[in-house]
């Protein structure tokens, strides 16, 4: 069995101007839903004596980003939670890993204005945004038997923009 947690919303604002309800909504959808779905999946995986959980985070969970304190905190929290869960359930044959996308061509990145797009592209060594298939291929790998000895890790898929 395998579950992919891929919740992600943004409600951006500078921290001093951010409404607490916007903070909470992003944390609830991005981080808390990942925890709750993982908890449910782990119960099923324990019965089946194996499983894989793949949590989608974000490059900004590692780097921070202007006006996205809530989003960055939610995605960094997923990384830390995944490491803890990986430790808790490794002996039960459950692998828990993250994929941390950089800037991928999606509806979320379509909202970025053209000038900022150029700035971002200049920071990506591969000089392009990723494709959704780049993330899908990473998911397929972590869901496969080829990744059975990988646990508690984050696979960075970002064209070299962030290197851990």
Where are these regions (language model features)?
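Substrate-binding pocket helix/loop in short-chain dehydrogenase/reductase
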Residues: 14-15, 22-27, 109, 120
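Active-site loop immediately N-terminal to the catalytic Tyr-X3-Lys motif
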Residues: 16, 63-69, 91-92, 127, ...
